[in-house]
Amino acid sequence: MQIPALADAEELTCDVLVVGGGTAGTMAALTAAERGANVLLLEKAHVRHSGALAMGMDGVNNAVIPGRAEPDDYVAEITRANDGIVDQSTVRQTATRGFAMVQRLESYGVKFEKDEHGEYAVRQVHRSGSYVLPMPEGKDVKKVLYRRLRRREMRERIRIENRVMPVRILTADGRAVGAAGFHTRTGAFVTVRAGAVVLATGACGRLGLPASGYLYGTYENPTNAGDGYAMAYHAGAELTGIECFQINPLIKDYNGPACAYVANPFGGYQVNRHGERFVDSDYWSGQMMAEFAAEVASDRGPVYLKLSHLPEESVTALESILHSTERPTRGTFHAGRGHDYRTHDIEMHISEIGLCGGHSASGVRVDDHGRTTVPRLYAAGDLACVPHNYMIGAFVFGDLAGADAARFTAYEGELPPDQLRAAHDLVYRPLRHPSGPPQPQVEYKLRRFVNDYVAPPKSGARLSLAVEHFERMRTEIAQMGARTPHELMRCAEVTFIRDCAEMAARSSLARTESRWGLYHERTDHPERDDEAWLHHLDLRKSPSGAMEFTARPVEPYLVPVDGYAPTGGTPRHLGEIHPEQVATAGPRDRAPIGSNTATRTPTAKAASHSPRILEALALAEGEPELGAFTGYLTDPDPAVRSAAVAALTESAPTGVGPALAARLADADAGVRAAATRGLLELVEVLDPEPELRTGLLRASMGSDPEVRAGALEVLRALRLGDAPHYAGLLTDPDIEVRLAAVRGLVSVDAQDELVRATTDPAREVRVATARALLSPTHLTPLLDDGDALVRAAAYTSLAGAGCPDDLAVRAVAALADPAWQVRAGAATALSSAPEPLAVPALTTTLTDPNADVRKAAVLSLRAQATPEARTALAKAVNDADADVRAYASRG
């Protein structure tokens, strides 16, 4: 498709723009229309079957029905489940308005289970509170809502645009004024001016990668890719609790819930493989998930939903609910495995991570009417941070947002041109390079990083690596290619997922404590810290474009809860959260510093457009004789000669070795480098002929250090060099050449010549020499070297060379060296030392603070193989380090 001009955008106007036609979005549209507003409802799929609700629903999790539950009890329950970090005013809206919403939905045609007396059949699932209200025909809820939207009085006020996907909320004068997006079937650019905007795009369900590896095999509806999180963030709204992930128990290998809360009233329950109940937590929370995860990982796992003990009528009733309402494909899944609830309990596992305000607490910050921190921008449903809000809460806040937004009329000013251009570029960028990396590959890589570095248990190091990966992937995402409007939609979703991934990683870094059980388990900050962190963690996009954070104290509760006493107070501005320095051997101010190496300036290659380049490269497609390359290898253009060298390397005709060696003397550094790489690449198949040896010897004495080092490596590999030649290059000014000379001397067993390198000015050369020397006499001077790594290498080599009494005494003394590398080397040396000296010293070393030193001691004790050594090893089987434990256990 062609990129449409920005000037050709289709412009729509409304009083209230609702983005997302799922649970909250449909209710927001209905309420706003009932209040007299002209509503535009945008849905990137089709409203009739979009959103999480369309995947099936078996009941209401949080129905506060008068006579069966009290609003204040529910508020307290949710406060405890969320470890005290809640805005009770929002939770109380769901508690007090939920029953009226049930009745409203019932008036639309949604069916809720009732008993013989016509009373709502509320079930008790947890050890306190009765909030679960089954919906025997929950699969039809979206159909009922769509029917309501299509009523004549609603059609007069609500315009539905299916297959239109907003990508950015437009703002002017600090408030929301519309949106920009595109049509996912035609590709047309669409702009909307609105008096208010309600975001109801659901969770970010496509954040982590499912265990199956399927991009769309997620627990949540996979079309919910975090669109609203990203749009709210870029519009300047605050998000909060993003570090509190959504993680759910599910059926193993199936992207749907096990529905233990449905089975519990029938007598089903979760058990480990021994049939034992194991969940101590009293409410569906991160703490429950922590218990669940621990049980799965223990020798008591796997974990099951036990149903096989139930009577036939209970099983039949459960089948009628579970196979037709929540995930209707469930029955097919079990049948495909030959499983039946009567004979097989259901193996459970843990879902991938996601962001969801309605099932955990990660969402857009809203007040008790769904208002965000950006005027006239609202959020509702799973996108909004109203902890454990579930379906009824989504309906309630959709209603609240729609009612409040209906106060505003359409924006009449100019839509911001800079924001329109940015949105246009975001949408159509993949069309500019249609052959770029496809969305599935880029998305898979992105979400694999989420699993590897962001999913709990979390640590500062892994989260820091996550930030690094997500920052780098901005470029890869910008290079994605697309050819159709549908592919454009998927590419845009990947940008949303990346934004959410970065928010998740940085938020998790910012909260330096553990809270919410498994949802935010920090291995480097394992304790909950209410004094410092009984705070909401808010994030926003600063005016400079950086992601910045604020710790906002929890306001005093409306409903007191034992164990928590928030007092509010002044927010603590944290600013940007920077990743820790990781992926290095240690802090750079303490790491060993190598010798200065001459800087090699990369060769700048002038652009060449000679057709002979293509001709030379084309030679590799056939099986040419060496003579076919001659003219190209001597072409005046170095780019042609480089291309000829590459083709020659690829085709490798007879005589390739001497031909490449001849190019080592080329006048152009790029050609010489290509020839060096070619020889190293082909070294295993080269014929060690005299002509090649002559060319290599000549090149090893040339002016190019890269060529000299490469020529020495090929000489060594082909056994064409000799000790005098290698020894003569031990004084070469380039470190890499001297290292190659050391390796050459080792290859011809020239120990006497090798000793000359023990005084080399470069640490790297001395270390290589120490590792190669085979005589304690030759190694002794290096034990006094001023560099710790050289001493460590020398002691390590004593293990193979033999460690006589006098050197064993020195090794024992070296166990107290400040450098752990030296201590580890000394411990290794003692493996070949006399037992009376070695074993007592090694036994003491088992308490060294460095794990690698302890590991070296264990390995040396195993080599000693005396009763005293075995006694010492028995003490190390409970060491904190896995390697130490493993080797000690092998005795």
Q: What are the roles of these predicted feature ranges?
A:
Residues H49, M101, E106-R193, A203-P210, ...:
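Conserved redox-cofactor binding core of oxidoreductases
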Residues A607-H609, P638-A639, A669-G670, P705-E706, ...:
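Alpha-helix N-cap/helix-start positions at coil->helix boundaries
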